[in-house]
Every structure is written in C-alpha cells, then in structure tokens.
Amino acid sequence: MSPTTTRLALLALASPFILPAAASAHIHPDEFAPSAFIEAPETVDCTLEDGSEARCHRITVGYLPQGLEIGPFCPATLDDVGGIWDWDGENAGLYRVDRTFLVMLDELGYRFFDDDGTVHVVDIATQQPADDHACINVSADESVEITMLLPVNPVMAETPAMLGVVGKVGVSLDGVPIFSDAPSVLMTGHMPALDTCGGHIDPGGWYHRHATSTDIDTVFEGAGVAAHCALEQDSSAQFGYAFDGFPMFGSTEADGYPAIDLDDCNGHVGMTVLGEAYHYHASEDFPNLPACLVGVQAQNNFSTTATAGIGATRAGQDGRNEPPRPMNGGPMNGGPRGGPGGPPPGFEQAAESLGITPQALMEALGDPRGGRPDLAAAAARLGITEGELRAALPPPPGR
C-alpha cells in the first residue's frame, strides 16, 4: 500500500464525514413534482461557501405549490383544534394546539386566550402582537417568488454546518422550502403554530416546512399525538434535497427497516433509488430533520421577492412586518442569549447570584445561535445543579 493510499485509509477511518466524498450524489430535477416550479430549472454558475466555483441548479417556486392545501394553524377558540407545536418548556413534547395544550400553557404562566376562550391570534405581517402571548397566523402573499440554488455535484465540507433555529435545510420535492426549528415560545413569547404537515407561512407571505412532512405520521404515532398529514406518507421515500445537494429520505430504508449507522447529521452512504450515495434520513422524533448539513452550500442560495421575512430582497417596501424577535435579546430560562443591547435585564444579577461573572455564565450556556441551550450541560460546566441554574436565570417573557 502506497503512503498516499495509507493516509486516505486512515482519514476515512478517522472521520465518518469524509467517507461520503467517494459516493457523490447528483440532483435529479425530474424527481420534483411538475407543479413544484413556476419556471423551468436552470443550471448556472455559482460560488460555494468555501469560495470554490461550481455549477448549481437554480429553481424558482411560488409562495405555495399549486393545489396544496395548508393549515389549520391557530384555533380561533378553545373549542377549536389548530395545528401542532413542539413545546420545549416544562412538560416538553409535541402537542396539538387545542384546549388541553393551551390550558396547560396557561397553568405554566403563558396565557394565550381570553376569559371567554377566544385565542389570541395575530397576523404579524400586518401588526405586532398586542398580547404577551399570541398564536401567529400569517397571511399569504400570492405574488411572492422564491429562488434557490442547489449544487449540481455535492461537495463534502471539512466540518458539518449546524442548523440551529430557522436554519436553511433544503427543499421538498413539491417545491416547499424546508427550515430547521421554528422560534421557541421561550424566545419570543409567541407561538408560530405549524399545521399537521409541519409547515406555516413566513412573515414574507410564503409557506415553508419545519419537518419531513411525508414521514411525519411516524412522529405522531411515536409521540401519541392525534394528528395526520394529508400528504401521502411513505417512510422510505425521498422527501427532498438539502441545500448542500444531498438527498433527504424518510426514516426507513427502501426495505422498510430503520436506517442504521447514521452520523451526527442523520445521514450515511447507502443504496437508494438514486444509486449508492450519501443521503440524509428523517428521525422518528420531532423535528424530524437533520441537525446539521455535511456538504458545502452555495452562497446566496435563498432569496425571495417578498418584502419581509427570510431572504427578502424588497424588505420594508409594502409595510409587511418582520416577526417578533426574542424579547430583550434573551435569555428566557432556556432561550438564546445576547442581543444588540448586550445582556438582558436580570442576566448580570443571575450571574452574581451564582457567584460567577456574566461572561462565565454566557460561556456555560453556549452559542446563542444554536437555539435553546442544554441547561443540564451548562449546570455541569458551572459545578451546580440544573435546578439552581434554572432558578437563577431570568423568567421567560410575560411571566
């Protein structure tokens, strides 16, 4: 064995993320539904995030695929049933947005309804929430067009890119964009409820998903949630493509057995209907999407003609609002920290009560861009109990 061959073998053994480089995937535009595009896909020159030049598929979709029915999101009253929400506070879990769930939140200090049972519902495209806690139900803008770039030949990155909150994941085969976790109620005080296919409307007026919708019934069954997505459910089918160009499938292999030997991004090299290549799998828990992407994405790979929201190229031109941001910049007993104005009220006092500096507390909680911190791990770093840390942190908004 030559020195070069030996070195490559050692590198392959050292990192599961290097193995897929030898098993490249290629995007097949004909895998998408004919109704996915409002313009025929084009192959164009593009620059990847590592600075290298490449070729990308440029695909353009509308605010919503033709014929796709969405919702419901927010219930009008406690007697109605809305969509779903992945609650990450006390009694964490996936819930239907209904009376039982909203009353539970009320008992925890998050009141989303009036005394007569009317739920606080707000269209943040037209107005900011007037209540401490409101269910967000955004109006659509049928004029919006979305343009995305996907590498024709995926390239493995040196290290995976963590997705965090509202990170760009990819696009489903019906043309709906996919993003990672929606903002937590613990971050903003408000609930951007999802429909039972895991989607909702962005402040810019276009529909997107936060789940693998064609395998979401697997999640509902495991979580004991009485919900169903009207899309055809197939745990072994391809769901879409990630923004790094690698395909995404449901939670099982083609033979119906669970996917095994998955890396931290829930992917591996294996045989698919597209051939043997690296691909991602959905998980059986919500959100059932990859936590990271292993490939290199294209620069400026997502833009919209909207006047608000993610990727908006005409921000502020028609008066649509941006979404509510984390109040005071966090931290809200589990939400992200930091903000333009520095530590929020109560953060320095929390550090003082623990006998540490604000900087030490911030470092223990970790990077705010990664979403809700692991309080148990942060407490362990500080040498205290999780209960002591929770008690010291400022309360969530509106409490």
Predicted regions and their residues:
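Short, recurring structural edge motifs at helix starts
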Residues: 192-199, 261-269, 363-366, 375
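Bacterial N-terminal signal peptides that target proteins for export
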Residues: 2-10
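Disordered, low-complexity segments in secreted/periplasmic proteins that are enriched in proline
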Residues: 314-352, 362-377, 381, 390-399
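Solvent-exposed N-terminal domain segments of exported/luminal and surface proteins
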Residues: 26-187
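Bacterial N-terminal signal peptides
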Residues: 9-20
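Long, compositionally biased interface segments
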Residues: 26-36, 45, 260-340, 399
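Short helix-loop boundary/capping segments
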Residues: 186-194, 204-258
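Extracellular/lumenal glycan-associated surfaces
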Residues: 144-150, 172-176, 202-217, 273-287, ...
